[in-house]
Amino acid sequence: DIAVVCGKPEFLPDAHLDTLTNPILIVEVLSPSTADYDKGAKFEHYRTIESLQEYILVWQDKKRAARYTKQIDGSWLLSDFIGEESEIKLSSIECTLTMDDIYDKVEFEEEAQN
């Protein structure tokens, strides 16, 4: 998983030094055991982080990603990206990622068996 901060990282007081309070972008890799939590309760918590602008979910077993982008009114817009040709524009950090960028050196089970 990845968190991006612009400026100086801020952490929860009296907590472990890995609890950021000011990320602008969070990327989560979904696993079968955590996918429901990452898409549900965890994202609900992340939506309370004022600085957060984008939340990206990346599937580990196929070339698929979902991007939630915070809108001006505070709502979140979902965009799905499926397949080799998809590109994800990350407006929070002015960057575009292709599926090949995201899945570089990843071998999926069906590819490994062929």
Predicted features and spans:
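C-terminal interaction segment
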Residues: 1-49, 54-114
